[in-house]
Amino acid sequence: MNKVSFQGVPGAYSESAAKKFFGEEIDAYGTDSFEDALNAADTKNSSDDYHCILPVENSIEGTVGQSIDAITNTNLHSIGEVYLKVEHCLIGRGKLDDVTKVYSHPQALGQCSDFIEDHDLKTVPTYDTAGSVEIIKDLEDNCAAIASSLASRLYDVPIIKEGIANNSNNFTRFLIFSRENTTESGNDKTSIIFSVKHEPGALNQILKEFNDNDINLTKIESRPNKNTNWEYNFFVDFVGHFSNDKIQLVLKNISKNVLFLKIIGSYPIADLD
């Protein structure tokens, strides 16, 4: 049975994504932070069937920055991706007119900002969507949470209103991590992180390498470098597997013009369904 660590508590969207990727029969383990989730799968006692799953991108709110920062420092390799349709519910013991305060993860609060504004609700950020249901279950009726219907069932707190996201076409992309690498499938994506010198044309030189070798970039995102003010790391996804000869040559050329380069991993491209 696959063991999967994730950030959050039972009922979190990450747990649902893990079950979508591995199947319902998994040994899921919730942690307090993205770093803890990665570390749980990277201990000496972790077996080959121990994985970690992290959200990296949402179709409405964009990149999950804390997750990307944690990935920068892990020794694990990304071996898969999965897309999960996110269907937010307002959960609480009161009626909609009773609710004045709503608890949830900042990403979920952002994804439901129109509903929150329309009902003039005060927001309380929490570390996890499902965890917010656990928090409000014993609070007054004016307190509610934004989470999944699964969290409502697990913590036995009623759904006040379903489908409260700004956009019903709301998907979150997750990456799956392991101590082992993957082999080339023929339909792969690779994720890397790098930092360039703070000088004119430095980033363009890297991007030109991809362009000259006809490699399709599917994502590029900058994140502040935590060690040096006003310098940035770049998180990049591109089509292809790092074991491919052409990809290896490009990565070798890139490595000559960056301050650091980390290959997060290569994995089969997931369908958006």
Where are these regions (language model features)?
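Domain-level signature for soluble enzymes in the chorismate/prephenate branch of the shikimate pathway
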Residues: 1-273
